[in-house]
Amino acid sequence: MVKTVYVTGYKSFELNIFKDDAPEIHYLKQFIKHKIEQLLDEGLEWVLIQGQMGIELWTTEVVIELQRTYDSLKFAVITPFQGHTEKWNEHNQSKYANIIKHADYVDSIFHTSYQGPFQFKQADQFMLEHSDQTLLIYDEEQEASPKFFKQMLVDFMDKTNYTCDIVTFDELTAFINDLQWSEDQSF
C-alpha cells in the first residue's frame, strides 16, 4: 500500500515551457491527476515535493484541486535548503508562496541557505526514505536534471523493496492522445 508518494521530474524550462497558459501544462496536470487518483484508490495519504518549478509545483496544483474531493489527501513541501526561491522572478515566487499557503507541511532539510550540491543529494535521499513510492516523470531520451535522482532511485530500489513509477514520453503521449480523443468526442 502506498501511503506517501514523492512526485518529481522535469523543471518547466527543461520541457521548454515558459508560460503558465502553455497547453502542455493542462495535459501534464491531467496525467498527474490520473496517477494520483489511482494511488488514492490504493490508500494514498501524502504527496511530497521539493518545491521545484515544473512537475513538482504542477503536482501541488493538482493536489489542491483533488483535496476538494479527497479531504484526507495532504501534501508537503520539503526543500533542500532555505531560500531556494530567492533567485526566482517575482511571478514564480508569488506562485510558490500560494502553494506554500495551501501546504499541510513545509520544511527544509538544511536550515541554512545554499551551501553546495550535497544538499540536493541529501534531500533526494530524504524523499526516498520517507515515501513508499516515487512518481518520476523522466525520459532518458531527453536527459536533464532528473537523471541524477533517477540513478539514486535505481540504486535505492536495488537495496530495498521500494517501488517507483518512471513515466516516459511514450506513456505521456499515449495518455495525451487518449485524452485529446475523449475531449474531441465530448463536443
Curated annotation (Swiss-Prot):
It comes from the Bacteria. InterPro entries: YspA. Disulfide bonds: none annotated. Pfam families: YpsA. NCBIfam families: PRK13660.1. Belongs to the UPF0398 family. PANTHER family: UPF0398 PROTEIN SPR0331 (PTHR38440:SF1), UPF0398 PROTEIN YPSA (PTHR38440). This is UPF0398 protein SAB1311c. The lineage of its organism: Bacteria, Bacillati, Bacillota, Bacilli, Bacillales.
